[in-house]
Amino acid sequence: EIIDQIKEMAEKNSDNSVYCLIIGTIYSNQESDLYNVDSALVYYDRAIAINPTDENAYINVGSMYIDKSAALINKANELPLDKYKEYDALIAEAKVFDEKALPYVEKAYELVPDDNAIRQALRTLYARLKMMDKAKALE
């Protein structure tokens, strides 16, 4: 399998974060049979440890958490009005993922402050987490 070949390359080139980033990306692809968030996080963390100034791993981890949060928010919004307890539970769970995403997106923004997509993602996270002063500062 290609993933095994890339893992082998990552082991042979342990100072090159690109292989870990590629493996993380493969595991984080929801369309893939290899989709596995935990494995993706392991490889993204390795990529960050090897190259802490490469924004891509930070962006990808943040995006994984943001996607999980968004899915929960969408699920909550589809509930009937009388399911407010389930709604509150889903929103609370989404907040946990937003909180997990925040340091990764903040670091990505620190590394590439001119990237409008990262800026918007960070602004959205700040708004969801009710950090309005920080959200407004990014306008």
Tell me the role of every PLM-derived stretch:
Residues 29, 33-38, 67-104:
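Short coil/linker segments at helix-helix boundaries
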Residues 9, 46-47, 108:
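Canonical positions in the second alpha-helix
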